[in-house]
Amino acid sequence: MAFKFNAEVRTAQGKGASRRLRNNGQIPAIVYGGSEEPVSIILNHDELNNAQAHESFYSEVITLVIGGKEVAVKVQAMQRHPFKPKLVHIDFKRA
């Protein structure tokens, strides 16, 4: 199963900005690795929450569309809420 998500570059950093994103149904994330600089991004929570239910989400290469440019990544780390079925943050590594 191929996964493809639209992402926005995140400019506001910090705890307050991340909380505002989560309250609006979005997830802060980061893309790093390779020769490019790390990029902070914003993703839709519901899309990712549904996709992460599939086992292949963790092993396959995922395509992120960041500012019109496609980036191939793999999930490096995921942080989940302690008792709610919510994602808190995701780290992606360039494939």
From Swiss-Prot:
Looking at the Swiss-Prot or TrEMBL record, what is one Pfam family this protein matches? Ribosomal_L25p
MF terms (GO), sorted A to Z: 5S rRNA binding; structural constituent of ribosome
Q: Which GO terms describe its cellular component?
A: cytosolic large ribosomal subunit
Protein name per its UniProtKB record: Large ribosomal subunit protein bL25
Q: Please name the taxonomic classification of the source.
A: Bacteria, Pseudomonadati, Pseudomonadota, Gammaproteobacteria, Pasteurellales
Tell me which UniProt keywords the record has, alphabetically.
Answer: Ribonucleoprotein, Ribosomal protein, RNA-binding, rRNA-binding
Provide the leader sequence positions: none
GO BP:
translation
The record's annotation in HAMAP family points to: Ribosomal_bL25
Identify its protein family: Belongs to the bacterial ribosomal protein bL25 family.
Q: Which InterPro entries match?
A: Rbsml_bL25/Gln-tRNA_synth_N (IPR020056), Ribosomal_bL25/Gln-tRNA_synth (IPR011035), Ribosomal_bL25_short (IPR020055), Ribosomal_L25_dom (IPR029751), Ribosomal_uL5_bac-type (IPR020930)
Source organism per entry reads: Haemophilus influenzae (strain PittEE)
Q: List the disulfide bonds.
A: none
In terms of PANTHER family, this protein maps to:
RIBOSOMAL PROTEIN L25/GLN-TRNA SYNTHETASE, ANTI-CODON-BINDING DOMAIN-CONTAINING PROTEIN (PTHR33284), RIBOSOMAL PROTEIN L25_GLN-TRNA SYNTHETASE, ANTI-CODON-BINDING DOMAIN-CONTAINING PROTEIN (PTHR33284:SF1)
Outline what the protein does.
This is one of the proteins that binds to the 5S RNA in the ribosome where it forms part of the central protuberance.
The subunit field of the Swiss-Prot or TrEMBL record says: Part of the 50S ribosomal subunit; part of the 5S rRNA/L5/L18/L25 subcomplex. Contacts the 5S rRNA. Binds to the 5S rRNA independently of L5 and L18.
